[in-house]
A protein has these predicted regions:
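Alpha-to-beta junction loops
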Residues: 45-46, 82-85, 103-111, 156-157, ...
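C-terminal motif of bacterial Sec signal peptides marking the signal peptidase cleavage site
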Residues: 7-11
Length: 283
């Protein structure tokens, strides 16, 4: 399972222009023994994210991951006193996110990571920093699939990713034999393009990125049927790190860097910046 991981030590962002980087908190000090103090002292941080999610976490030809998740992660690193070039990016596909946190392969994960009770049995979450909703993506000329209720009537095969919340939820709407699972959403998009499946399901913002990159081949059905709060995955019980991240998020809203992170990434397709959801309790 860990063989699926890939690592990029490149700094993130679509440009090497340092004006696009968040302001680094160089004078910060932390309580001894906390995760924050450990990372500041080490002078580097390992962050898990997606490498195949347009607009949220996508590794470019230059080896640099870009997207909203990447920018949120950079904001946290900056508050730790670490510039973007001190980040080691670790690919964290859906099925290994808990594993890489538990095994210490990353210090935290920002990877379209829905907060739910099952995952909380293994790890803790800071945030949420964004709320998405599950939707469907189909071919642009498809008029039969108008929402999740239409999947059975159309006898449609639908694709999602192993270990993801959407893969579980779609079982309520599609016959089990018609659910196809891969390890990354880009393979689902390929399956839709070749006709192996008739729909792809995950959170609407992820699908929006796939639609944007499809050159008109795909469309979003546009009928979200869940609420998916995205959290930042950390080691279970690390309350102080959770509180630090939550304060970083509220500070980012106050100083405008949260809105900027959106506008520089997903906002290029969906211009209206989201509101920060109500933050969960750290415990």
């Amino acid at each position: 399972m860990t063989a699926a991981l890939a690592v990029s030590t490149a700094a993130c962002g679509g440009s090497s222009d340092t004006s696009n980087q968040p302001s680094v908190n160089t004078d910060v000090t932390f309580e001894s023994g906390t995760t924050m103090a450990t990372l500041k002292s080490a002078g580097k941080v390992k962050i898990g994210t997606k490498f195949d999610q347009p607009l949220f976490g996508l590794k470019g030809l230059d080896g640099k991951p870009t997207g909203f998740d990447v920018e949120v992660a950079k904001l946290i690193a900056a508050k730790l006193g670490l510039a973007a070039d001190k980040i080691e990016w670790v690919e964290a596909p859906s099925k290994v996110r808990e594993e890489v946190i538990e095994q210490g392969k990353v210090d935290f994960v920002v990877a379209t990571y829905t907060i739910n009770d099952k995952r909380k049995e293994r790890i803790s979450f800071a945030g949420p920093y964004y709320e998405a909703g599950q939707d469907l993506m189909v071919k642009s000329d498809d008029s039969a699939i108008t929402g999740p209720e239409a999947l059975k009537a159309a006898n449609a095969k639908v694709c999602s990713v192993t270990g993801s919340t959407p893969a579980e939820k779609i079982k309520e709407y599609a016959d089990p034999a018609n659910i196809v699972l891969f390890d990354v959403y880009s393979k689902c998009a390929d399956a839709l393009r070749t006709g192996q499946v008739q729909a792809v399901t995950t959170d609407n913002v992820i699908l929006l990125g796939l639609v944007d990159g499809s050159k008109g081949d795909f469309k979003l059905v546009g009928k979200p049927f869940t609420k998916e709060p995205y959290g930042i995955g950390i080691k279970k019980g690390d309350t102080k790190f959770c509180e630090f991240i939550n304060k970083t998020l509220t500070d980012a809203v106050a100083d405008g860097s949260y809105d900027k992170a959106w506008k520089d990434t997903a906002g290029k397709v969906s211009p209206e910046a989201p509101k920060l959801p109500a933050l969960g309790t750290c415990s």
